Amino acid sequence: GEKNIPAGHDNEVVQRHFAKVLDEAKAMEKLGKVRAVNMPSGIKQTTKYPGCGPQFVWGAFEMDMTGQVIASSTYLTAINGNFVKLRVHYPKGDEQGHKTALLFVEKIRKVLGKCTD
């Protein structure tokens, strides 16, 4: 594994690892574990949360798992020399699932940042 991972989301080590994460999703399709991985161009984005807590590089894509299309997002940053990777999934079109996933990421970043607000 990686050693001496710099903190944050925008360094070369984290960016390189994020590219591997996306490649893993594509590989799952080739191995037949999922079908129809839909990864839009320009998938890589950066969070812009206000206040305390880390930011993440993230990307969202869709995949067919056993006949159900799943919306999937992966968030990545580094804290204390370690990668922190969050993956959230919910059925495509499930608005409550989408809202819950966004709230989860926002709350977990406050925990990771040891925020008091």
Question: What does each model-found stretch correspond to?
Answer:
Residues G1-K20:
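A short acidic-to-branched-hydrophobic micro-motif
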Residues C52-G53, T77-F83:
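Short, solvent-exposed coil/turn segments at beta-strand boundaries
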Residues A27-T74:
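Signature of long, low-cysteine stretches enriched in small and polar/charged residues
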Residues K3, A60-M63, T74-T77, V88-K92:
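A mature extracytoplasmic/lumenal domain signature
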Residues N4, N11, N38, N80-N82:
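Detector for Asparagine
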Residues F18-R35, I108-T116:
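Sec/Tat-exported extracytoplasmic proteins
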Residues L86-D117:
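Surface-exposed amphipathic alpha-helical segments
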Residues V21-D23, G67, G97:
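Generic signature of intrinsically disordered, low-complexity, basic-rich segments
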